[in-house]
Curated annotation (Swiss-Prot):
Pathway: Lipid metabolism; fatty acid beta-oxidation. It comes from Xenopus laevis (African clawed frog). It is an enzyme of class 2 (transferase). Involved in the intramitochondrial synthesis of acylcarnitines from accumulated acyl-CoA metabolites. Reconverts acylcarnitines back into the respective acyl-CoA esters that can then undergo beta-oxidation, an essential step for the mitochondrial uptake of long-chain fatty acids and their subsequent beta-oxidation in the mitochondrion. Active with medium (C8-C12) and long-chain (C14-C18) acyl-CoA esters. It is found in: Mitochondrion inner membrane. Keywords: Acyltransferase, Fatty acid metabolism, Lipid metabolism, Membrane, Mitochondrion, Mitochondrion inner membrane, Transferase, Transit peptide, Transport. This is Carnitine O-palmitoyltransferase 2, mitochondrial. It is a peripheral membrane protein.
Amino acid sequence: MARLLTSSSALRWRTITSSQPVLLRAYSSGSSDTEYLQRSIVPTMHFQKSLPRLPIPKFEDTIKRYLNAQRPLLDDVQFKKTEQLALNFQNGVGKQLHEELVQQDKQNKHTSYISGPWFDMYLCARDSIVLNSNPFMSFTPDPRPEYNSQLIRATNMTVSAMRFLKTMRAGYLEPEIFHLNPAKSDTLTFRKLIRFVPSSLSWYGAYMVNAYPLDMSQYFRLFNCTRIPKPNRDELLTDEKGRHLLVLRKGNFYVFDVIDKDGNIVKASEIQAHLQHILSDNTPTPEFPLGYLTSEERNKWAVLRQKLLDNENEEALAKVDSAVFCLCLDDFPIKDRVHLSHNMLHGSGLNRWFDKSFSIIMTEDGTAAINFEHSWGDGVAVLRFQNEVFKDSTQRPAISPESCSAPVDSSKAVQRLHFNLDDSLKAAITDAKTKFDTSVNALSIATMEFKKGGKEFLKTQKLSPDAISQLSFQMAFLRQYGKTTATYESCSTAAFKHGRTETIRPASIYTKKCSEALVMNPSKHSPAELRSMLHECSKYHGQLTKEAAMGQGFDRHLFALRHLASSKGLPIPEIYQDIPYAQINHNVLSTSTLTSPAVQLGGFAPVVPDGFGVGYGVHDDWIGCNVSSYPARDVRQFVQCVHQSLDDIFSVLQDKPLK
């Protein structure tokens, strides 16, 4: 169910107007010390108590939106049947379920109606989390080449990550806010005033100046957190007492403290010495690398983990689970963006522990990325962490190329973990590796860069850059496969307490009409007609985006109603047994976008065997996408078709003839 109902990755925040959101600048009470990133005068969780609750949409609106999304995917006969089933649901059992969901929500004001079901969806999913769940986001290289040495960058990022941890736990991290009118709200005056507004009212104070605080409830699971495999439903374990870092190299596991017993960050020169010790260690790769087990089917991994515990590995596993995070040091450089994507999304499996809340992966040439487990949180929290770590490690690096390691005995400070494996566990690791290799070898990745224009030009044309990107995917799929297909775009609902994501459904009657005109018969339409169609697409996509960000999509509402029926042991309502319902949730095009100065590239695998996983970004003067597929689709041809589609759109906008 998880693969049918969610994109692999929810990597973005959508604003609720067309204004460009501005990330909160750090106004601190002075932060020259090396322990913290900043010392915000507004406490980190100041707005959390007063965040608005995620609304449950009106039931009739959900049904209407669902049918609008189905219209471009169905012929008249199919649509009539689906429409009737939807209306029957609206006037029958669905109405009762909706009323019960509303009542349940009123009794649980501390959270959102989607939070529990969403955790269930992720944690009950039994497929491997590799490819099916974990995405990656790679860091932009340090602008100074000499700082991209693996040892220097790993040390600096580790220190910056610990500064983030300490800043957050001390309440000094700037609250996450998006400013729609920065001149009014992104100011020291605003901060000085808002910090004195009681936390039960603070959100309203921000709202009055068009500033939107975001939910930060996921942040505590960034560190010391691991997904633990259990039969039928996994658990999230967070142990904030852990002061050590987990480092993987050549499939070997090492731990050393990065926070001392007084709660201070261990000296950067000592961290450097310990990492140098690990990089110099000539211990061979284990014959049976344990990390492969985290790529197993979850029920099988749960059984194997219990076997590990029974074989006296409890202490070693506890070290892995409670580590602040996982640092994977790979012994090779990155060749190109496709190699980067494969390595950061899955790698060889040898040097990974996919269950950690996040891992920083760093190759020999200093190329770095975050691979994160998705059940605990979404891209908003991870991106904030990535932005802060990139900024701090490049602007305030703890060590430089001239720095010397501390004269400490790292052989005593660094512990290499040993695991006792019996024959059945060795066989299980071999089996897991075989399955892992088969899965990842089936994945293809292709990248595309369109250099003829981007956000700036599209804005001069009064067009939404995201709408145009999504239209190019619709056109590309039509050009390649001759039809319109189910499309998913993830959208954060972090503007609400315990919000997660909502779905934007970019395939519409407008994109279908426009795609068919541009791809199949552009000569039948005047340039003015084609431009008018582009504006129709942009306007409707903007409406869908605004609705989704405000919790007014249809996907999560229908999902919650189905979850409620299932939890009550009721028969599955007919609407959910309708073939078009399964088809619209079989997301052939699963898409997610983000742009940040800290992020070079992001990506994820398709969520269905015959799908594409489309990570994309619209920059000032170019548009890029990083796309994955399995053998059922031709990803290289698809990215060529996307490029051709963007070419055609920009030609129309520039009054050039279509090729």
